[in-house]
């Protein structure tokens, strides 16, 4: 075991629990209810507040503010938590807030996540593992983001929206509906522009699985019938395919937002 290395200018309040091998740089402030895991690093000027728990080997860069009270006007000081997983990278100016009584009193971030400069995780959010937030991504309260999702620079996600696993939200997109797993959304307001094929290839999905997802996508968003009717048709066609089932379960589960769909192609206007 290696004792924590704490710069003399850092303020570690009584009650804070600092793991073995942690490194806390100049002018950091760690609150009394913070739990900082083993081998974490706070480079400098990092603030950890509230009932915040951070997993081992997470690195946090200057001017990140983690665990201060939620940005929710209904918040009345109720005890709530923020839990961040292991091996995360949190860059300059990132903010993350704990939960509220309106959302389960906890905000959760999984392992191996990357949050680039000035990105934000709002109160009561659920962020999976291996998620990437590019610079200036804004995740409003009560949102969920699935494993391996990527949010491009400047993307904004409205309260209560869901982003499925392996999805891609394009830079500067404004997402006000739910993005299916493996989907790709673009624009303001964002529309479903297809599947995240490049992401699937990079993560080693088999060609036959990608082909099945493409076929299922075309059937799901065909013009005939209702979405739920098409869900059942796709379920019957791909009854043993796990990735397709994940999309269907996501749609069936539903949420407070609608499912993001492809943009309609305008009907050509006749010159006659």
Curated annotation (Swiss-Prot):
Keyword hit for DNA damage: no
Documented EC number(s): 2.3.1.129
Superkingdom of the organism of origin: Bacteria
GO cellular component: cytoplasm; membrane
Subunit structure: Homotrimer.
Role, per record: Involved in the biosynthesis of lipid A, a phosphorylated glycolipid that anchors the lipopolysaccharide to the outer membrane of the cell.
Protein name: Acyl-[acyl-carrier-protein]--UDP-N-acetylglucosamine O-acyltransferase
Source species: Methylobacterium radiotolerans (strain ATCC 27329 / DSM 1819 / JCM 2831 / NBRC 15690 / NCIMB 10815 / 0-1)
Lineage: Bacteria, Pseudomonadati, Pseudomonadota, Alphaproteobacteria, Hyphomicrobiales
Gene name as annotated: lpxA
